[in-house]
Amino acid sequence: MKTLVFHIFIFALVAFASASRNSAKKIGSQYDHYQTCLTELGVTEDDLFSIGEVTSGQHKTKHEDTKLHRNGCVMQCLLEKAGLMTGADFDEEKMRENYIEEKGLQPGDQRIDFLNSCMEQTKDIEDKCDKSLIFIGCVLMNEVSLPASNEEA
């Protein structure tokens, strides 16, 4: 019985540590052009929001507009360098293909609907930086809302 309780405790600890590590990561930090975009825009990693700040909505309430805009510009730079965005326009088909491949999704996965919804919600935003941050925030918040068994593989 002690062994079973110990294994359950270790499993819970590992799951919590993994979730905490992901929420502490900076948005966009997993992508190839991350450092390039930071350098081009004169932004430091300390200026960027963590995934946890975005998924909890804290990025909207605890930061001034200039920090929001800088974060959005970094996201736009990453999307543009990946060929997913030109100026303030998404390449929606390429965005879908890239997202499906990156996440290993199957047809009918709810995350594809979320992605489409986020693109629809942001389509009329003209400022490319604001549009990018709002879009990324929408996608991240939707992913967090899914049950654990439906998240990233």
Swiss-Prot record:
The record's listing under Pfam families reads: PBP_GOBP
Which molecular-function annotations from GO does this UniProt entry contain? pheromone binding
What UniProt keywords are attached to this protein's entry?
Answer: Behavior, Disulfide bond, Pheromone response, Pheromone-binding, Secreted, Signal, Transport
List the signal peptide residues. 1-19
| This protein's GO CC annotations | extracellular space
Q: Where in the cell is it found?
A: Secreted
Q: Which family does it belong to?
A: Belongs to the PBP/GOBP family.
Binding partners and assembly: Homodimer.
Name of protein: Pheromone-binding protein Gp-9
The uppermost taxa in this organism's lineage are: Eukaryota, Metazoa, Ecdysozoa, Arthropoda, Hexapoda
